Amino acid sequence: MSVVSTETLNRRIAAATGIVMASVLLSRILGFFREWTVAHQIGSSGVTDAYYAAFTLPDFLNYLIAGASLSVTFIPVFTKYAAENREDEGWHVFSTVVTVMGVAVVALVILGEIFAGRIATLIAPGFNPGERTLFIFLTRLMLPAQICFYEGSIFSAVQYAKGRFLIPSLAPLIYNTGIILGGVFLSSRYGITGFAVGVLGGAVCGNFLLQIYGAHLAGARFKPNFNIRHPGFWLFIKLSVPIMLAVSLSFADDWIIRWFGSYLQPASITWLSYGKVLMRVPLGLVGQAIGVASFPILAQLYSERKFEDLNRILNSTFKGLIFLLVPISALTIAQSQPLVHLVFSHTRLHEADLQATAATLAFFSIGMFAWGAQYIL
């Protein structure tokens, strides 16, 4: 590959990064407002602890089979067939993955619904009976959203592989909007449950229905089938398993936070959740945007076995990410107190809540560059 074509790839990554960064920025702003709405409508207490802990099991399924591994591994599988002028076969594999793995995720959600009570002991054993009951109820309410995340991740992957980033970038915006609307319009009557209803509604609209439409615009061809003998399906599984294990490990920090937090004073899980959400704003804006935008091009280079160009693009992307995240991390640590007060000062949080949230934000920001590198590696 010539230097000119390498520069062209860099420009494509930059253009795609711009689209994704704009989406991530808007999503993080909505994420700010989402957490602000929780703090404004509910405050911080054992009720909010139960709400945030209720994301643990759904998030685990999301990390394991939807949010990262399946969508990421499908892109190189599909681009492999496209690079070999076998796109029809690529659509056949797409249909198999959607059908077979869709049945699998539905089965996992059903098991989660059945055993949510037992799993609750592993997630937050320190909750009192009231918090535990609410925690289990909210978990069961939000679990079906993972079906939408799974299907949406595959339909988004098709769009990414086709160089279409706009509609997939809208998914988190609609998802966050659903949570906000659920809280604003339902929390006065149903309390924290209103936010959980918003989680389900946002997932259905943004991560499922909209992504089906986007995949249709990208030319997706789907016909249900269970052809698990196709080599493309097993290539997908082969690529997925190690990434499933690696990505699910990132879930461990959320589980640890909620496990230990359940033994601490009420609102501890809420403080930790607020701090982590704030840390993820610059992390997502830089790390997630660069990672999502660069991956389809890196996958294409790998499929074409252009390893020298792959290494060149990967190194330049990684260096750029570190160059941006290290100073952002330092600035966030230094300004954690005013940042937290700016976001949460006009809510039901007290000064002690703000101080605790600022401390967690500073602590989480220390590892921001490492979390950012994960999006690429």
What are these regions (language model features)?
Residues M1-L377:
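Membrane-embedded alpha-helical bundles of multi-pass transporters/translocases
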